[in-house]
Every structure is written in structure tokens, then in C-alpha cells.
A protein has these predicted regions:
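Peripheral interaction segments used for macromolecular assembly
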Residues: 1-100
């Protein structure tokens, strides 16, 4: 049996890189051809945005490219979403949010 979650169970949940909180889930992007979650829009913590992206302000949102993560690298826990990657690896999986 597969694990399931409703969007409201994921939105605004904390996102952790190994043991450090890096932000909160703000949006979910789904590939409508095969109904897979491909990206999570994460509002990064101010210190994470500064250290990983060089941003000078808080509230920076970036897309976390789920499809680039290996299976089992991300999982849901009581704390939120846990990424089995270090904060210094985040730049590989983040891309700017497209303006709408």
C-alpha cells in the first residue's frame, strides 16, 4: 500500500535538510501527464537564503526540484519534510520561482 497525503498536510510544513530547518512548503507543482509531484516551492529561512543563494532579504522562495532527488531522499516526518541532503548541497536542487 502506498503512502498518501493531502496538499493541506504538506503546505506550510517545515522543510529540513538533515537536521537544520531550511524553510516552509508554500506550493506544490504537479506533472499532469503522470500526476507526480515534481517540485515544491519552499520559502527559505533568512539565514539559508543568505548562505545558499547570497540573498540579502528573508522570505525568499525557490522551487525544490523533487525529480532531481533520488527516491528515499525526501520523507515526511512529524517535524515536516526531511531531506537527506546537507544545507551546503541545496543549491543543486533549488531554482528561482518563475514570475506569474
Amino acid at each position: 500500500m502506498s503512502a498518501k497525503a493531502k496538499s493541506k498536510e504538506i503546505l506550510d510544513k517545515d522543510v529540513w535538510a538533515v537536521d537544520e530547518k531550511i524553510g516552509k512548503v508554500k506550493e506544490i507543482e504537479i506533472d499532469l501527464d503522470d500526476w507526480r509531484v515534481t517540485q515544491l516551492e519552499v520559502e527559505l529561512e533568512k539565514d539559508v537564503a543568505e548562505s545558499v543563494l547570497g540573498a540579502k532579504k528573508g522570505g525568499v522562495r525557490n522551487m525544490l526540484v523533487i525529480s532531481a532527488l533520488e527516491k528515499g531522499t525526501i520523507r515526511r516526518t512529524d517535524k515536516g519534510l526531511l531531506l537527506q541532503i546537507r544545507k551546503d548541497q541545496l543549491h543543486v536542487y533549488l531554482k528561482p520561482v518563475d514570475a506569474t
